[in-house]
A protein has these predicted regions:
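Short, acidic, metal-binding catalytic loop of nucleotide-sugar glycosyltransferases
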Residues: 321-335, 340
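Active-site-proximal specificity loops/subdomain of glycosyltransferases
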Residues: 303-310, 316-321, 341-394
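N-terminal pre-catalytic "stem/leader" segment of glycosyltransferase-like enzymes
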Residues: 1-67, 71, 92, 258-280
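Donor nucleotide-sugar binding/catalytic pocket of nucleotide-sugar-dependent glycosyltransferases
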Residues: 124-172
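Membrane-proximal helix-turn-helix segments that form the acceptor-binding/catalytic region
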Residues: 105-129, 136-138
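Conserved catalytic-core segment of nucleotide-activated headgroup transferases in glycan assembly
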Residues: 157-222
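Catalytic binding pocket for nucleotide-activated donors in carbohydrate/polymer assembly enzymes
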Residues: 234-299
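Acceptor-binding helix/loop patch of EC 2.4 sugar-transfer enzymes
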Residues: 85-117, 270
Length: 400
């Protein structure tokens, strides 16, 4: 908790690289390693309402969060400033519309169900959405058109500098020492979606004179080293893979690629370049991510003042001085009048025509009703709801 309290930025994920060496976890770690702010990591299953309440002034980044109590999502939306890095399709109960169809025999309709609605609301409430590929963003926005309004960026998979440097060394060694021609690699995935059998079959059908080998059971760097010895990589996932690192690594190493359209970053301009151009693009991604966070921290803070009036001229309140005092430091001042008949409303209207930061509204009430005290609170609530600033400053009209 000490790390949490001292942090400016909070990373929330189901697992981190110490727990599992998957592509998502490597991207998360690559971003964490170059954090320009004090940043802590929290497992999604450990997040609770108390932490959210203590972290309202922090900036939160949500990665994979299936393990998080989804009942916390409305609390997060209402109280936190946050961004989401979307690695897959969390609105689907299978996190893959293709797996959904494979398992049920029906097209995915999760976007119409409660899960889809709560996940889309979580995305829509964020300061920024980071996608893995343009195709992924299109699939989301087709099902949830309101997400088009969100600030969003295609981030792609992110690589650490040491990983890119290691891959570059392997590429240079490969150019000098050579590689096994007519020999294709297939990466042994731990998920049906990786399409190992289909990848092997594609090599046999496309290059019948070539051999194919399935690589697995190796550490990350050993796998890259072994991969560099092959002529090409075959990767035919059975469903949409948002931005698979494997094909990026193979391309950086200089291998030929035999891939299908389920590789969803296929066709993006950066991925069509040579190894140096792809590396140049990847080197920019951490900065693109952290610039969004920096823009949040360095944003101008807007402040709205608000108050209420009712026959304040007749009451001889210092109402003009009260409003003027807020205009001295607020970006806008909202005044809700309760139905004045002593000239107050006319004075407010005339003043607002000369002062564009003064926003005046009238909500008439029956002040002779026995609920007049409740009406007073409701007037303040109306005024507050009309404020557009990030922060609000309330004053009674007899205060200066």
């Amino acid at each position: 908790m000490e790390n949490f309290r001292a942090s400016d930025v909070v990373f929330v994920a189901d697992m981190f690289l110490d727990d599992y060496g998957g592509g998502a976890e490597r991207t998360t770690e690559a971003l964490f390693e170059v954090a320009p702010y004090t940043t802590c990591k929290i497992k999604s299953q450990d997040l609770n309402q108390k932490m959210i309440e203590e972290g309202i002034n922090k900036f939160w980044i949500f990665f994979n969060y299936r393990g998080m109590d989804h009942n916390l999502i409305p609390v997060i939306v209402a109280n936190c400033n946050y961004a989401i890095v979307e690695y897959d399709y969390k609105y689907c109960q299978y996190r893959s519309i293709d797996l959904h169809k494979r398992e049920t025999g029906e097209e995915c309709d999760c976007h119409n169900l409660q899960l889809g609605k709560i996940i889309s609301a979580f995305l829509h409430g964020s300061e920024h959405i980071f996608w893995m590929s343009k195709k992924q963003s299109e699939i989301y926005c087709e099902r949830f058109p309101f997400l088009i309004e969100n600030n969003q960026t295609v981030l792609s998979s992110v690589f650490s500098i040491p990983d890119l440097e290691y891959i570059e060394r392997l590429r240079k060694s490969r150019a000098v020492d050579g590689y096994s021609e007519n020999n294709w690699a297939v990466i042994d995935g731990n998920s049906w979606i990786k399409g190992v059998d289909e990848s092997v079959k594609s090599v046999n059908e496309t290059f019948p004179e070539s051999t194919v080998e399935v690589l697995g059971g190796l550490s990350y760097y050993d796998l890259l080293k072994e991969l560099s010895k092959f002529n090409g990589l075959s990767f035919h996932p059975l469903g949409g893979d948002t931005c698979p690192r494997t094909v990026i690594e193979a391309s950086l190493l200089g291998l030929e690629l035999l891939i299908n359209e389920n590789v969803q970053n296929l066709g993006e301009e950066w991925f069509g370049g040579d190894s140096d151009e792809i590396e140049d693009y990847l080197l920019t991604r951490p900065q693109v991510f952290w610039d969004v966070v920096t823009n949040f921290f360095e944003r101008p803070i807007s402040l709205s003042g608000y108050t209420t009036t009712k026959n304040v001229i007749q009451s001889d309140y210092p109402w003009q001085a009260s409003i003027q005092s807020m205009l001295c430091f607020c970006d806008e001042v909202v005044v809700v009048d309760g139905g004045s008949n002593d000239g107050t409303w006319q004075e407010l209207e005339n003043w607002s025509k000369k002062e564009p930061r003064l926003k005046v509204y009238q909500v008439k009430r029956d002040w002779d009703d026995y609920r007049f005290a409740i009406f007073d609170g409701q007037q303040k609530a109306v005024a507050r709801s009309l404020c557009k600033g990030e922060w609000c400053w309330q004053m009674d009209i007899d205060e200066v």
